[in-house]
Amino acid sequence: KDVPGYATLVQKNTLESLDDYITDAGINLADFNGITDQVTVDGSLYELPFRSDYWLIYYNKDVFDAAGIAYPSNDMTMEDYDALARQLTDTTYGSQVYGCHYHTWRSAVELFGILDGKHSILDGNYDWMIPYYDMILSEEDDGVCQTYTDLSTEGLHYSAAFSNGNVAMMNMGSWFISTLISNLDSGEYDSSLCGNWGIASYPHPDGAEAGSTIATITGLAVTSASANKDAAFDFVNWVSGTEGAKVMASTGNFPAIMTDDVINTIAGMAGFPTDESSKEALNITNAYLEVPY
């Protein structure tokens, strides 16, 4: 289940605590990059994540090349990202290039602010979001990105925005990788417009570690009513562990544990960017849930 579904099941006492199973199996929860800490309830863990989609920066290499600007690094502060987007922007009527693009989801804007590990959307006081909204409103005013109003009115999907070929950078989840690859392969996207692409690590606030990003997870649990709890946990452990992660990666999905084998599998997919920097962007250091428990 996703986190809201997990929360409901925990509150209804329908899930078995996995604490003893995890200890007995010798599972290293650090492999999950902090995700399990965020779904621990009163000191106990009732699920193990097996899938995790996290956010990255997608960029159009042709736009960068045309501007003579180096591709984004895997260690950008928010200030770096804003400055780079402004460098790439061309507001000339009829040949506009947007330095960046933000989809209309709240996640695309306000969750930059949770990457310092000090805040979440459950805080109650949201003053920490102000600098990020201010930055993006300023970008809208200066033509660096399309406005929320225009995007909402037009109903422009993020995939269409990127595939148009006039967006330099876009923040979006890892699920877009397989979409981009398959749509370019099928001819739905024009490869002359967006076929030369790469990914970079998510930009972060000053003081936050490079490779920090926001994530969503899907987890597996053992029901407290199960007559075969040990067998059920064996399955949970396999799917959420390194062997299950390899299988997930081989199908184009992102597992919750990102080992070197997993990264090599994803980076080895036909259509994935061949540059080393894009492969390195698959490494994350801290994952903060969009919706924590």
Role assignments for model-derived ranges:
Residues 2-54, 194, 198-200, 272, ...:
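Hinge/lid segment of periplasmic solute-binding proteins
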Residues 68-73, 137-153, 166, 190-196:
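A local structural motif
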